[in-house]
Amino acid sequence: MSNNIPINTLSKHKAFVYDRIETNAGNAYNSTTGKFTAPGDGMYVFHTSTAAYDNSYCTFEVVKNGEIKDIGLADAGNHSDRALSSTMTILSLKKGDVVHVRAGIEYGGRYLESNQYVRMSFSGFKMT
C-alpha cells in the first residue's frame, strides 16, 4: 500500500486493497478489489505484512473463499511507535479460488502505517 490507512475507515472484514504493485504475472491480483484469483491448481505461498503506529492495533486475516486461513496482529496499542506483524501462509488452491487479506474483528487507534518508513504488503507465488 502506498498510503496510511486511518483506523476509522476500517470495518470488520473489510478487504485491504494493495495499490502498489511491483509484479502481477498473469494478472491474478485485482488491484481494485484486493483479491487474488488462482489461475490454476497448485500449492501457493502468500506473505502479508501489516504495520500499526502511534497507539493503534489491528488484527488481519488471510482468507480463502471466505474461510479464514491465517491471522496476524499488529499491536502498537500501548505505545507511540511502530508494530509490524507478518504471516506466511501455504494454501492448496484450485483454479478460481480467491485469496485476500482483510481487517479482522479487533482494531483501534489512529492508523495503519504504509509510507516511506514501512510498507504494508501482500505477495505470493505458486510453489507447484
Predicted feature locations:
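Extracellular jelly-roll beta-sandwich "head" domains, especially the C-terminal globular C1q domain
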Residues: M1-T128
